[in-house]
Amino acid sequence: MVMKKLLFILSFSLMSFMTLAQDVVVIKHTNYTTHFSKSKKYPVMVQWETTNAMVTCPTPLKRKDNFKPDPQLPVETNIGNDYVKSGYDRGHVMPAADNLCQTPQIQDECFYFSNMIPQTHRLNAGDWKSLETATREWAVISSKVRVWSGAIGEEKKIGAISVPKQCWKVVQIAGKWKAYLFNNDLSNPDGFDNNEVPLAQIEKLTGFKFR
């Protein structure tokens, strides 16, 4: 009886892993790699490095909000109209400002929908943006930071897109780790530093291992 139960659990876990593997598409762009969920229509994880040279230059590019489908996943990411009048921002995972000292092509890649999460404006323009700014400052100080970021869960749908319950970010700075978890609503405490959590909590929630 115990053996049958164990085999059932192992079989269920394997099926869940296979389903996830079939759903998530990994796409490599110049400055970031996105793990895009075809069912949720948002990236469960995006990973990149931000360096001092990427964010400090005498003539940074002007931001162009050229949101568009990812050419490597055109059908699944042709979701721009779903954001219209939805009440949610097209929240960057890898920030556009991390590419202002790059080429126009690299900046354009940052506006693919495979790098977007539906976020409340309060989060996107508030603590999420403040954490993005802090991460760039850490990159200047330490010359480079490694970043993993994404979303989990489903609060509701806007068109075909799942609105995630939570957004998270992990930053490695000179061998030290920082992890942050935000609810995608109005319930977060003010200040991104007040949303710092143990790295193990992010690993448990997402299933990703960072160390």
Residue ranges and their predicted role:
Residues 7-14:
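Sec-dependent signal peptide hydrophobic core
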Residues 16-18:
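N-terminal signal peptide c-region/cleavage motif recognized by signal peptidases
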Residues 27-89:
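Short, His- and charge-rich active-site/binding loops that engage polyanionic ligands
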Residues 22-24, 210-211:
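Short secondary-structure junctions
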Residues 1-6:
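Positively charged n-region of N-terminal signal peptides that target proteins for export
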Residues 23-24, 31-36, 166-172:
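Short, surface-exposed beta-strand/loop micro-motifs that present aromatic residues
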Residues 71-211:
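Domain-level detector of nuclease and nuclease-like folds
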